Amino acid sequence: LPVTIIDDQEVIIGFYPKKLIPALGLQVQVDLVGKTSWLAEKYVTMIGATIRAIAELSPEHLHKSLPWREHWSLRDLFMHVLSFPELAWWSHQCGSMSTEDMRATDRRLKDVQTAPAMIAYGEGVRQNILEFLQSNNVVAFDRVVPAHYGGEVTVLELLSLILSHSTHHLKQAYWFIDHELHVTLTNPATAEDLEGIVTPAALF
């Protein structure tokens, strides 16, 4: 996690603009309306691309093992792409996105194994996130939650971090489908579709 130390006295752990902006004396305003609109658009795009990819693959494809992640199949990677946004969204209710929250979600979703079930789950996640981001619920957006990714962050900041995280894993799935399964998807997300979503330069 990032750590900011101010005047050798104040320590701020995590990506926490609500504390960092006043502590550093920054004269900036956070545009929540613009932020939520952009996040909603990109989540609809990213989750939609994930759903389309799942729909084109056979059961054999979905259960192929990944060479870079022991004990994971392509199905597991796709469920990771979809479940982390759900966890980030749900943090506005449960108050965290912890490793235990992640393990509980894995247990809850362990029987979601077929493409239709995965697609139905993804569509539900997309709808919940879209409705939340369009709700103008500033109190929920600004709720500070402890998260495995980012430290102490607001729910809106967590959704932004997880958008990047899931998009990076979607790109890994695209690579696997192309290079290992030798399947050409008919309508993958383009670079333009994902423009503005920051992901690591290294794919793995």
Show where each model-derived region lies.
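Non-globular targeting/processing and membrane-anchoring segments
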Residues: 21-35, 39-41, 45-67, 77-81, ...
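A general structural signal marking secondary-structure boundaries and capping sites
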Residues: 27, 54, 61, 96, ...
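Acidic/histidine-rich alpha-helical segments that form the ligand environment
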Residues: 36, 42-56, 107-146, 153-172
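Non-catalytic, surface beta->alpha helical segment in thiol-disulfide oxidoreductase systems
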Residues: 3-30
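Short, contiguous alpha-helical
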Residues: 61-107, 144-204
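Short, proline-centered helix/strand-breaking motifs
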Residues: 1-2, 58-59, 200
